[in-house]
C-alpha cells in the first residue's frame, strides 16, 4: 500500500479550476463593480439632495401662492366695495342734478306763465 500524498491534489490540465491569474481578474472585476456602485451611490445622493431642495422650493412657492391668493381675494372684496361706493356717489350726483334741473324748469315755467 502506498501512503496518500499530503497537500492538495494536482488538477488535470483541462479541469477548468481557477488558477492564480484569474483570481486577480476577479478582484479587478470586483473593484470595478464596487467603483460603479460607489458612483451610483454618489449620483443617488446628489439626486436625493436635489429632490429635497426642490421640495423646499415647492413648499416656499406654495406658501407664496397662498399669500397671493389671499391678497387677490382681499383686492376683489375691496374693489367691489369701491365700485359700490362710487356707484352710489354717482347716483347721488344724478339725483341732485335732476332736482336742480327740475327746480330750474319749475322757475322757468312759473316765470313765463305769469
From Swiss-Prot:
Transmembrane segments: 93-111
Statement: the UniProt record of this protein carries the keyword Aminoacyl-tRNA synthetase: no
Ranges facing Cytoplasmic side: 2-92
Modified residues (N-acetylserine): 2
Subcellular location(s) of the protein: Cytoplasmic vesicle, Secretory vesicle, Synaptic vesicle membrane; Cell membrane
InterPro entries named among the record's database cross-references: Synaptobrevin-like, Synaptobrevin/VAMP, V_SNARE_CC
Alphabetized GO MF terms: SNAP receptor activity; syntaxin-1 binding
One Pfam match: Synaptobrevin
Any GO BP: vesicle fusion
Membrane topology of this protein: Single-pass type IV membrane protein
GO cellular component: plasma membrane; SNARE complex; synaptic vesicle membrane
Vesicular side: 112-114
Domain v-SNARE coiled-coil homology, residue spans: 29-89
Main location: membrane
Region of interest called Disordered, as start-end residue ranges on this chain: 1-31
Keyword field: Acetylation, Cell membrane, Coiled coil, Cytoplasmic vesicle, Membrane, Synapse, Transmembrane, Transmembrane helix
Keyword rRNA-binding among UniProt keywords: no
Family (UniProt): Belongs to the synaptobrevin family.
Function per UniProt: Involved in the targeting and/or fusion of transport vesicles to their target membrane. Major SNARE protein of synaptic vesicles which mediates fusion of synaptic vesicles to release neurotransmitters. Essential for fast vesicular exocytosis and activity-dependent neurotransmitter release as well as fast endocytosis that mediates rapid reuse of synaptic vesicles.
Name assigned to this protein: Vesicle-associated membrane protein 2
The species this protein was found in: Xenopus laevis
Amino acid at each position: 500500500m502506498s501512503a496518500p500524498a499530503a497537500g492538495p491534489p494536482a488538477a488535470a490540465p483541462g479541469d477548468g479550476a481557477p488558477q492564480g491569474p484569474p483570481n486577480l481578474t476577479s478582484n479587478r472585476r470586483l473593484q470595478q463593480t464596487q467603483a460603479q456602485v460607489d458612483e451610483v451611490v454618489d449620483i443617488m445622493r446628489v439626486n436625493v439632495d436635489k429632490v429635497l431642495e426642490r421640495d423646499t422650493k415647492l413648499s416656499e412657492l406654495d406658501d407664496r401662492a397662498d399669500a397671493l391668493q389671499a391678497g387677490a381675494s382681499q383686492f376683489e372684496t375691496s374693489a367691489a366695495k369701491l365700485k359700490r361706493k362710487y356707484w352710489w356717489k354717482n347716483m347721488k350726483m344724478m339725483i341732485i342734478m335732476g332736482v336742480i334741473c327740475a327746480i330750474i324748469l319749475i322757475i322757468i315755467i312759473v316765470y313765463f306763465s305769469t
